[in-house]
Amino acid sequence: MSLNLLGDGYVETIDNRDIEQNVLQQGQAHLGIAGVAVRAPLLEGSASQPTTQVGRFGWKSQHTSLMSSCADSLRNELGIRNRLYPDEYPTLAATDGPTPFDTPDAKTHMTELERLVAEIRQTSPPARDANLAVSADAQAGEKLFAQIGCAICHVSTYKTVKPGTRINGGTYKVPKFLGNQVIHPYSDFLLHDVGTGDGIPQAAEPEYLDQSTANKFRTAPLWGLRFRQDLMHDGNSPGTEAAIARHGGEATKVRQRYDHLTPAEKHQLQQFLKSL
């Protein structure tokens, strides 16, 4: 399944420490939830800067920056080479493949890859349904969402770093419109085993492949949920009820709490989810 990109510029500016803090808080919940913070390579970083940061993009948090993530998608999903992924596939003998996205524009002096990333950083997070969000049922459902433990992984709120902060190994200066912003992505950006694993580890570069994460997935951000019908990584859950039913593994105890809600309480929680 394709991933939502709207608002990812804000996700990029979440402090690494805030994501790592989620690991500690989950351990304190004593529900068998044990998220993993992935160390992902910063492909655009220089040799003099730290080479890894906390991953947050991709189904397995295999990327830590939008530049790295977009470069990977161009190369491995569209077959378009670029400066971060300059090579052809070893199995292909082509020497005249697609031109890398690295030719600066005469006016902006930005490459196509840089313009693509800049465009994604400009996007706003999906807005909630304003009317449904203030309804009594949705507000009650939001409280239930937290009470039964859904919010342990689907963390609602972060504040982005200050404007002017240099992130991504110093390669990116956070602009004013992204800095000091309170956002509500509803994700911890950690990897979890909820029983739906595909057995495929993913990493930005082969040396970072970790077989222990093969059956784990990043907690899917829930903002914009109301615009999607086919859920989970494989799209095999037609709606939120079906997606909740597939939450096993680390999420088993929380799912059981949902199962024990009354029909009225389940309706309230579903109304909250429909407002996102």
Question: What are the roles of these predicted feature ranges?
Answer:
Residues 1-276:
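Periplasmic c-type cytochrome electron-transfer domains
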